[in-house]
């Protein structure tokens, strides 16, 4: 009897995805025939079929693409700053949506997909903590900012980035309740299950926006949950 493995692991081992993040994006986009959960335990000998290549280097791209479409946000020609770039899902999505240039900033290193690292439109800022960001480190003043960070709240991550933005900036940021709520509101496994807690977290972010020199244009829930199952919300901001 063959051993079982996670579906996303098998997809990478078979060469059907470049990374587990990309494998998860494929499954969540419905592109792996017969499967709907990336964590499904699958027979090692099972036949797997990917019906279409992924659009983006990671599932983050699918998240951002949905938000752009849902909110009618245009980024063509924009100079962008992607805070918390990681593998580069947001960066990839921005470029495919017509962004002129993107700074991919992340506190880690070596994570950005080689395709993006080699793209002349992308400036890579690694080992860069956004809280310590100096505007002179950026090759331009961003007109559009995205933010997807973990283990830090938006109140700490966003203001330093906005301080470097051009006049009339806009931002589309991902609110992750598990990193915004207090420890008492985060359940087992780091998941916020109570919708009232999520609503309170979102209200807190909206209430803080004026202090960042911003006003909220719209919000939308991401149809793709976080890796542990957390519901996440995009907030669309503009300069006050």
List PLM regions with ranges:
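S4-like RNA-binding module at protein N-termini
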Residues: 5, 16-75
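Conserved class I S-adenosyl-L-methionine
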Residues: 76-86
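Conserved SAM-binding loop of SAM-dependent methyltransferases across substrates and taxa
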Residues: 87-98
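S-adenosyl-L-methionine
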Residues: 103-156
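A short glycine-rich, Lys/Arg-flanked "PGG" loop and its adjoining helix->strand segment in the class I
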Residues: 155-172
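Short, glycine-/aromatic-enriched active-site segment of Class I SAM-dependent methyltransferases
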Residues: 177-194
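Short alpha-helix
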Residues: 198-212
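Core SAM-dependent methyltransferase catalytic element
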Residues: 224-240
